[in-house]
From Swiss-Prot:
It comes from Klebsiella pneumoniae subsp. pneumoniae (strain ATCC 700721 / MGH 78578). This is 2,3-dihydroxyphenylpropionate/2,3-dihydroxicinnamic acid 1,2-dioxygenase. The gene is mhpB. Belongs to the LigB/MhpB extradiol dioxygenase family. GO terms for biological process: 3-phenylpropionate catabolic process. Its EC number is 1.13.11.16.
């Protein structure tokens, strides 16, 4: 059956700290073009690989991968809030299939997700509730992290399952590219932050959430003035990564360790593993071709911002 893929960077800073209007218009055109192609594809099912930013997953239990059999977006940074339309029976069947493939996938019947999941559904489909979705969390910030190889194998297992469904499937990857915003780390946390990282942050009081969001906004403003205030963006790495995906050379990423990736491109760059999972899933459908590649480093959003599509060849 036919499948379509789109991978897109996300940023909570849209509307809070934006680049100049010409750049913003350029990004909006890229997203609008991707949205048009997706609408023409008319998906019957979406599989969304995305990370979390200590809004739904914490160190009380931190799985490398988790499939939401029920999921709700919290609406952080003015992103869309509400329930995701997860087809529960299909999600359960998917979980069984992936576990039977030898991949240790966790499940959640009450998964809480943030802008990392909400933004691609908003930007590319027009809302959270437009198409049934299987939301798959990939841990991209909370060490210890899954590596490229294990993430690729997860994607391949997902693709084999999807290819049995006889549906038009849209495969989305959300995150990256190179970036290192001010994400907390357990090893450096004081007592209050440690409590939040161990699960106390799941239901933050509104004033504390606002202070947390303002810290990110302030960091972005500083980064536009002083590129040394955060880990620099790495356009060379970002473009190399996108080229490897376009050429189907996913396994070449297996040799890159997590510490090496953090040093090259920033500690939140591990979100790009959502792109790897998406392309690995697409590979189960047979021949495909890429299209719509876009890349620009955008310091206002603390991100190497990328967009890339691919479609199976019938």
């Amino acid at each position: 059956m036919h499948a379509y893929l789109h991978c897109l960077s996300h940023t909570p800073l849209v509307g809070f700290v934006d680049p100049e209007q010409a750049v913003l218009d350029e990004v909006n055109r890229v997203i609008a073009d991707a949205r048009r192609r997706i609408a023409e594809f008319d998906p019957e099912l979406v599989v969304l690989f995305a990370p979390d930013h200590y809004n739904g997953f914490f160190y009380d239990v931190m799985p490398p991968f988790c499939l939401g059999i029920g999921a709700t977006a919290i609406g952080d940074f003015a992103s869309a809030a509400g329930d995701l339309p997860v087809p529960a029976e299909l999600a359960e069947a998917c979980a069984h299939a992936i576990l039977n493939s030898g991949i240790d996938l966790a499940v959640s019947y009450n998964m809480q997700v943030d802008h990392g999941f909400a933004q691609p559904l908003e930007f590319l489909l027009g809302g959270l509730d437009r198409v049934p979705v299987l939301p798959v969390f990939i841990n991209g910030v909370a060490a210890p992290l899954p590596g490229f190889q294990r993430t690729r194998l997860l994607g391949e297992a997902m693709g084999r399952f999807l290819n049995t469904l006889n549906k038009r499937v849209l495969i989305l990857g959300s995150g990256g590219l190179s970036h290192q915003p001010p994400v907390p780390e357990l090893a450096k946390a004081d007592a209050h932050l440690r409590d939040r990282l161990l699960g106390g942050g799941k239901q933050l009081p509104p004033d504390e959430r606002e202070r947390r969001q303002q810290r990110v906004i302030s960091a972005a403003r500083r980064f536009t003035e002083d590129p040394h205030s955060l880990h620099p963006l790495n356009p060379v790495w970002d473009n190399r990564f996108m080229s490897l995906l376009e050429q189907g050379r996913l396994s070449e990423l297996d040799a890159i360790g997590n510490d090496e990736l953090s040093a090259m491109a920033g500690k939140s760059t591990h979100e790009i593993k959502t792109w790897v999972a998406a392309f690995a899933a697409l590979s189960a459908f047979g021949r495909w071709r890429s299209e719509g590649r876009y890349y620009r480093p955008i310091p206002e959003w603390i991100a190497g911002f990328g967009s890339l599509s691919a479609t199976t060849e019938i």
